[in-house]
Amino acid sequence: TTACSDWDDHYDANGIVTGSATTTLWENMSANKNLSDFAALAKKAGYDQVLSNPQTYTVWAPLNGSFDYETLNNMDLATMKKQFMQNHVAHFNYPASGSVDKSVYMINEKMKKFVGNGTYTMGGLELVQPNIPNSNGTLHAINGKLDFGFNIYESINANDYPLDSVSAYFAKYDMKSLDVENSVKGPVVDGQITYLDSVLVEYNALANNMRAYINNEDSNYTMILPTNEAWIEKKQYVDALLDYLPSYQ
């Protein structure tokens, strides 16, 4: 359809750093012995297919030994994919050339600062080998793993704080929808579009109803939440004041 063609054109490879690049991001990554750990995790997450297609990407790939490969390899696949792999890949070309001061949205919708002039950093990490050209984008080798950075929405469910009661209550209103623009389209099967990588937008209907878009990282919020102990105490107090119908008890 026209819409699908437009979507493909939106991410068609263009403006490659050098016009002689003939191999894909995946081919270059998988052939680079200094990026073998990152390439192994990329393949595990299905990004060998994503980074082989003709849409344009920039990858900031951490060098071997600059991150904890074993921990990531043993992580739940969905978590590793979102917090690590999608955290190092962005749509479009972001070359390290001249003066750069950009806020880059990664595939997982985390924002990173890409800055420099002669020497460059991404998310505070040095680009040790910038501008490795590819037929479908640009590859930068970096010295370390980019920080994931939990937003408020994610922190509530991270189990790092005594907020289980609040988390369970909010979870009733958790929603997900497909981010068509950032998902990577695959072949059409039986007339239906398939995706090599489906990016899901997570949001909370309860918070959104209060116009508290706590999963939106282009805004800043402060949220004060009760601990489990405080939640249970106040809930019991309120429950004693209310006379519930039998069907709501």
Predicted features along the sequence, with ranges:
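Mature, structured domains of secreted/extracytosolic soluble proteins
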Residues: C4-Q249
